[in-house]
Design a protein with these regions (language model features):
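Post-HEXXH active-site segment of zinc metalloproteases
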Residues: 31, 51, 64-91
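Short alpha-helix carrying the canonical HExxH Zn2+-binding catalytic motif
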Residues: 53-62
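Active-site scaffold of zinc-dependent metalloenzymes
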Residues: 26-51
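Auxiliary, metal-adjacent structural segments of Zn-dependent hydrolase domains
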Residues: 1-30, 91
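Short, low-complexity, polar/charged sequence segments that are solvent-exposed and flexible
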Residues: 41-44, 61-65
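Extended aliphatic helical segments
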Residues: 14-15, 21, 41-43, 82
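Short, solvent-exposed coil/turn linker segments
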Residues: 2-3, 45, 67
Length: 91
């Protein structure tokens, strides 16, 4: 996966199309993000650069409850790619 703004935009689209609000804010996040499940809000550390934001999204997306029926075809492909990468790293 390339560490470009386009890749980040696609990852953000997956989260947003799944009904989550994605915000970049200051905070003392040990992992670079915070998930507020009840409100479907994801807060990422705004000081991360593009590569850090992408890596954080790759860690974050598999933890979210995502209904793939809500995703566009492009977002479904990106979501499956992220899950495959996550499963590969877990082994």
């Amino acid at each position: 996966m390339k560490y470009t703004q386009t890749t980040l935009d696609k990852l953000e689209a997956v989260v947003e199309e799944a009904g989550y609000v994605l915000r970049y804010e200051r905070g003392s996040f040990q992992s670079g993000y915070c998930i507020l499940e009840e409100r479907k809000v994801v807060v990422l550390n705004k000081f991360l650069q593009t590569e850090g934001r992408i890596n954080t999204m790759l860690d974050l997306i598999p933890q979210l409850e995502i209904n793939t029926d809500l995703l566009s075809d492009e977002s479904k492909r990106k979501y499956k790619e992220v899950l495959l990468k996550f499963e590969t790293e877990e082994k």
